[in-house]
């Protein structure tokens, strides 16, 4: 889950008839009264200990006989040879119906120990449209009033226009616009003035640092200029154009990008996200994927459109996990076999279940899920358990709502990852700086060496590890790079490390694909964690460290700054490298 206000990550509503339409209505009228839309539900057998689940066909027959219910489709859970061996078999039913009918059937399902029925809710990347700590937004006008246009021109420090930057103003409501080819964005304010704004936030699409300007001096009678700095201008980024780039988080964890023996070759990693731009030089080696948001008449995912990443989120995660370093980021496992499963925009619980089924059927080793929901789904939970039984480690972002860990990260079958920031890795006039705690809280949300738990990260006992998640620079579509925040960025760091373990640790070689295999990989990754000096509900066991090309040395109690990493070795991982 990323905090990326430059991209609105709304997903499609689960497929239902148009508003007001009933099954069998036929052609839609050109004009129709707006009514409450029907809802789609996932209905299936519940896997309860000691109980035989209700047969899928029995469920289907009952639904077909219920007035007002439309069968929308099915979710095939596993290939026959998988569930014949003792796993979860059969299929779930997707059905839409009026809200009152859905509530009635849900009450009946809740009383059953062999059946579940839950709404097919859209998943989220949790990209915040309103940053934290902008203060109380002033009330918007009660009715439409005169429009006050305010022009903001965004240029780089070299004078070039910054195209497709998102300019957001917070004050009397919320106003947003994107820059055009000349770097110009027009913010249209409805009534009021522009001298009482709380903040102006400029988020470039790629290659520049963002700007966060509190109490901005905007005027409607002139052009307002905002100048952005290239990413490479900030020394803490350690970025040199045209050279392989290793981010601050990777360096902090011990990845230097120079050890040819640690590439992830032989492991399979899946990225369940928004797709991947394989035209990006750092991602051009990724060849396998499916678009679960684009289905043919036979319900088969499109095998090509996964390369069209309109949200950029999946490409950013892919860079951290498996970037090849070609004019861009060098990720943890550039030679791993990457499977891209596109869920966004449009992903709901049904798509996530289908993606997890794919991972079981294709013997994936590690899965990255930088997504979540504030609602739960039994079907997803059961398929997460099936993935664990198939030997798969599923890494899930904790969430960015600054509250309890979200679903499915809260499941015992997930490796839940929160976000970690470090002072000095971003300029002070960016919103990255605003994510740090307002007050130093040693032992709670702030640790040594400038480490901190960002305000947005979800917290709770379910958090197992933390991962770098503030100002993480990685690949975005079009060949550029961008700095993003979020537990969505923390999770790929842990996914990348787990992929290296799956590829190179001798204990994994030849192991049967079962729950023990997944637990061994996950537990080993957790064993690499070093305390970061903060409360466990924010960071879990800490940040995993490894250095594969240094002499053994005692590990510190607190994660070091990146410059200190040459003197740190995780003894456990060092044992792997000697085999």
How does the language model describe each region?
Residues 2-133, 258-264, 268-278:
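Long, contiguous interaction/targeting segments characteristic
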Residues 2-7, 69-152, 170-174, 178-244:
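Autoinhibitory propeptides
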Residues 36, 53-58, 148-150, 155-172:
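Short, ordered, surface-exposed loop/turn motifs in non-cytosolic proteins
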Residues 159-178, 182, 190-194, 203-332, ...:
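Active-site core segment of subtilase-fold serine proteases
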Residues 164, 318-321, 339-344, 392, ...:
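Hydrolase catalytic cores
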Residues 281, 409-503:
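Extracellular S/T/G-rich loop segment that most often corresponds to the catalytic His/Ser-adjacent loop
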Residues 319, 346-369:
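Substrate-binding/charge-relay-adjacent region of secreted/lumenal peptidase catalytic domains
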Residues 360, 364-369, 382, 390, ...:
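C-terminal subdomain of the subtilisin-like protease fold in secreted/lumenal serine endopeptidases
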């Amino acid at each position: 889950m990323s905090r990326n206000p430059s991209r609105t990550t709304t997903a499609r509503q689960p497929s239902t008839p148009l508003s007001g339409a009933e099954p069998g209505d036929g052609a839609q009228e050109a004009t129709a009264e707006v009514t409450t839309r029907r809802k789609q539900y996932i209905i299936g057998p519940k896997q309860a200990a000691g109980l035989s689940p209700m047969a899928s066909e029995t469920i289907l027959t009952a639904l077909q006989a219920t007035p007002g219910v439309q069968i929308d489709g099915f979710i095939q859970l596993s290939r026959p040879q998988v569930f014949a061996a003792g796993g979860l078999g059969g299929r779930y039913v997707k059905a839409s119906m009026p809200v009152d009918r859905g509530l009635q059937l849900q009450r009946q399902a809740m009383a059953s120990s062999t059946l579940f029925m839950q709404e097919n809710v859209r998943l989220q990347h949790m990209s915040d449209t309103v940053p934290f700590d902008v203060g109380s937004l002033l009330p918007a006008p009660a009715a439409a009033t005169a429009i006050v246009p305010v022009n903001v021109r965004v240029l780089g420090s070299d004078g070039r226009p910054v195209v497709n930057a998102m300019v957001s103003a917070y004050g009397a409501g919320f106003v947003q616009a994107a820059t055009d080819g000349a770097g110009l964005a027009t913010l249209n304010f409805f009534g009021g003035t522009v001298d009482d704004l709380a903040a102006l936030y400029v988020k470039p699409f790629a290659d520049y640092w963002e700007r966060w300007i509190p109490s901005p001096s905007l005027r409607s009678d002139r052009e307002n200029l905002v100048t952005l700095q290239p990413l490479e201008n900030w020394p803490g980024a350690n970025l040199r154009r045209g050279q392989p780039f290793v981010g601050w988080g990777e360096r902090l964890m011990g990845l230097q990008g120079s050890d040819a023996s640690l590439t992830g070759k032989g492991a399979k990693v899946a990225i369940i996200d928004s797709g991947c731009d394989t035209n990006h030089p750092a991602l051009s080696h990724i060849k396998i994927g499916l678009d679960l948001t684009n289905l043919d008449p036979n319900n088969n995912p499109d095998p090509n459109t996964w390369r069209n990443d309109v949200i950029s989120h999946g490409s950013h995660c892919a860079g951290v996990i498996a970037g090849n370093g070609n004019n861009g980021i060098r990720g943890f496992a550039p030679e791993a076999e990457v499977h891209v499963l596109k869920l966004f925009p449009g992903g709901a619980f049904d798509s996530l279940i289908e993606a997890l089924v794919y991972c079981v059927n294709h013997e994936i080793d590690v899965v990255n899920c930088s997504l979540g929901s504030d609602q739960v789904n039994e079907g997803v939970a059961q398929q997460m358990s099936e993935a664990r039984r198939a030997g798969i480690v599923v890494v899930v972002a904790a969430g960015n709502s600054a509250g309890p860990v979200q679903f499915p990260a809260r499941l015992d079958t997930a490796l839940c990852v929160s976000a970690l920031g470090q002072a000095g890795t971003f300029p002070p006039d960016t919103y990255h700086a605003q994510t740090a705690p307002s007050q130093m809280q040693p032992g709670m949300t702030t640790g040594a060496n400038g480490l901190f738990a960002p305000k947005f990260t979800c917290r709770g006992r379910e958090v197992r590890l933390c991962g770098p998640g503030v100002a993480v620079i990685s690949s975005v579509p079009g060949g550029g790079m961008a700095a993003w925040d979020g537990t969505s960025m923390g999770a790929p760091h842990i996914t990348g490390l787990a992929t290296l373990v799956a590829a190179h640790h001798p204990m994994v070689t030849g192991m049967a694909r079962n729950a023990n295999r997944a637990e061994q990989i996950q537990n080993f990754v957790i064993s690499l964690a070093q305390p970061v000096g903060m409360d466990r509900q924010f960071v879990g066991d800490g940040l995993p460290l490894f250095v594969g090309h240094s002499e053994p040395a005692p590990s510190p109690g607190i994660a070091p700054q990146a410059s200190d990493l040459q003197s740190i070795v995780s003894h456990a991982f060092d044992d792997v490298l000697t085999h």
